[in-house]
Each structure stands twice: as C-alpha cells, then as structure tokens.
C-alpha cells in the first residue's frame, strides 16, 4: 500500500503553510517599528534594538518549548545529538541574522533593505544547489527567482527617488543578515530530516535570544515602555510570529525541496509593504497597479518553480 504524503508535502499544504509564514513575517516589519515607539527605542540605539530582539526571540523559544511540552505531555528536551545542530542554527538563524539585521536596518534605507532581504530566497536556492548539493539548479528555478526578485524590486522602487546607496554598516549589514538567513534555510532543511524541527526551532530561538539579550544588555541597552499593556501585547505577538512561522517553516523544509519552499519567501516583502501601508500609512504614493503587477511577478515565479515536471 502506497504511503500517503504529509499534508505539508502536497501543493495545497505547501501553499497554505508558506503563505501563513510569509504573512506572519511580513507583519514583523511594521511591528518592529511600532515596538521601537512603544518601548522608547531611538532610531540609532543599537544596544536597545538588540535587547528588544533578544527579548522577542527568548520568549519565542520559551513559547515553543513550553507549548510543545504540554502538547506532547513530555518535556521538549534536546538529546546530546541535538546540541550541535541547535548551536549551529542559533548562530546563523537568530544570532547572525538578527544581530546584523537590527543594526543594519537603522542605517539603511527601507528600499535597499527590502531588495537585499528578498535576495535571501535566491541565495538559499543557490546554496542548496552549489554548496550543500541537496538539489539541482535548473532553468525553472533561476527564472522563478528572477521573476520573484523583479516583483519585490518593482514594489519597493515605485515612488522612490531611484537611488540605491550602500554603506558597510547599513546595507552591508543587511547583506550579511541575508546570507546568514539563506544559510539557515538550507541548514534547517538538512537538520530537520534527522532531528525534530520544532525542537530545533524552539531551542535555537532560546539560545540565540539569550545571546542577543546579553549582548544588548552589556552594550548598555534599555527598554522603557511608554504604555505597559500595548508593549506587552506587541512583544507577545512578535514572539508568536517567530514561534509559529519558524516551526511551520521547519516542517515545510523537512518534507519539500528547499527551492519549492524558499521561492515563497518573495511574498515576505509584499506582505510587509501591504501591512506597513495598512498599519503605518507608509507607501501612500505606491500605485495599486504597481502592487498588482508585483504580485503577479512574484506569483509567476512561485508557479514556475513549483510546476510539476512532465512524466
């Protein structure tokens, strides 16, 4: 009897799971800006930004660990063989990615940051094919990534002055964050085949979050909420973003090729633009036609990468 595919390995499951993740991650962009205001963090206070990030990911790790321990009716405790992948993932996925992201974002333009961030999806597919040799690169994957990147570039360049500055501690840090994120995507796919992906996600968040918190604290960072209740509600939601999205993403990478999952990441900046416009009133000058064309390009790239091969 033929074994049935896990739901997340089917095309409907893949699409639904990826879009849920992308919507959650897209909401993080406006939430970070709202969080800076609620916690009284100035634009160039790197120490407090890292402390804020560390608190978010520490809570995310605790939520995954406690939640899954209750659901499974046993402690979600890593075994000895899980320690190494947890440390490697926390180094790339949380510490490396978000150390550079939170510092670089305060010094880079939103336009250039979004475009660089979108390249993580292309880099993940390139790393999977050329560095880790977990899958092969083909014309469809390259074309799909190119269309997705074009869509993100279009929606970010519209209404801008067309300039694309670059400074090492700004866009350079965003690029370093992007490389770390792309590498972590490949590593999650590899480790999740032999280890519990949710366990890895929870513990690497906790380890990475504690490291970022320590760095921010030692640098002199402080958090001074202007209003307690909204600030607490926001940090809880941001922890939920990380806990749910990364746990689900790990499951998707465990049962699908990296290329099929990563190409959906081009939806992150699209959700980010739409939610920033809705929650922050940003991008008022962006034409609805431009957004629609960008969405079509991104969706076209996703379809090309996920198109079934002819028998």
Language-model segments: which ranges?
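Glycine-/small-residue-enriched transmembrane alpha-helix faces in small-molecule transporters
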Residues: 1-54, 163-190, 210, 235, ...
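C-terminal-most transmembrane helix of multi-pass membrane proteins
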Residues: 2-8, 57, 156-157, 231, ...
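Juxtamembrane helix-entry segments on the extracytoplasmic side of multipass membrane proteins
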Residues: 10-15, 45-48, 78-84, 157-180, ...
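Specific transmembrane alpha-helical segments of multi-pass solute transporters/efflux pumps
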Residues: 28, 69-113, 117, 154, ...
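Hydrophobic/aromatic residues within transmembrane alpha-helices
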Residues: 35, 52, 104, 130-133, ...
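Transmembrane alpha-helices of multi-pass small-molecule transport proteins
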Residues: 38-93, 123-127, 180-187, 202-220, ...
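Helix-helix packing/entry segments at the starts of transmembrane helices
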Residues: 55, 94, 98, 112-120, ...
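Loop-to-transmembrane alpha-helix entry segments
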Residues: 117, 133-154, 164-170, 281-301
């Amino acid at each position: 009897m033929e074994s049935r595919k896990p739901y997340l390995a089917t095309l409907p499951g893949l699409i639904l799971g990826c879009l849920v993740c992308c919507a959650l991650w897209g909401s993080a962009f406006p939430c970070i800006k709202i969080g800076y205001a609620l916690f009284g963090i100035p634009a160039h206070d790197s120490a407090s930004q890292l402390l804020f990030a560390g608190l978010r990911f520490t809570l995310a790790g605790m939520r995954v660990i406690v939640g899954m321990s209750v659901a499974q009716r046993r402690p979600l405790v890593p075994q000895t063989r899980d320690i190494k992948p947890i440390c490697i993932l926390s180094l790339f996925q949380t510490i490396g990615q978000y150390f550079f992201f939170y510092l670089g974002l305060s010094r880079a333009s939103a336009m250039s940051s979004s475009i660089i961030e979108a390249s993580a999806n292309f880099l993940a597919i390139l790393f999977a094919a050329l560095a880790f040799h977990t899958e092969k690169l083909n014309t469809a994957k390259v074309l799909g990534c190119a269309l997705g990147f074009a869509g993100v570039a279009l929606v970010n360049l519209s209404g801008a002055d067309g300039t694309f500055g670059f400074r090492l501690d700004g866009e350079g840090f965003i690029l370093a964050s992007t490389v770390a994120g792309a590498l972590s995507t490949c590593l999650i796919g590899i480790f999740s085949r032999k280890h519990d992906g949710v366990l890895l996600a929870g513990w690497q968040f906790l380890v990475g979050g504690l490291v970022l918190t320590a760095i921010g604290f030692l640098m002199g960072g402080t958090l001074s909420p202007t209003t307690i209740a909204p600030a607490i509600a926001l940090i809880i939601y941001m922890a939920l973003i990380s806990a749910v999205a990364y746990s689900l993403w790990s499951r998707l990478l465990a049962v699908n090729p990296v290329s099929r999952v990563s190409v959906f990441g081009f939806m992150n900046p699209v959700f980010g633009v739409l939610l920033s416009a809705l929650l922050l009133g940003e991008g008022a000058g962006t034409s609805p036609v431009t957004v629609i064309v960008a969405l079509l390009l991104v969706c076209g790239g996703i379809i090309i990468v996920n198109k079934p091969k002819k028998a």
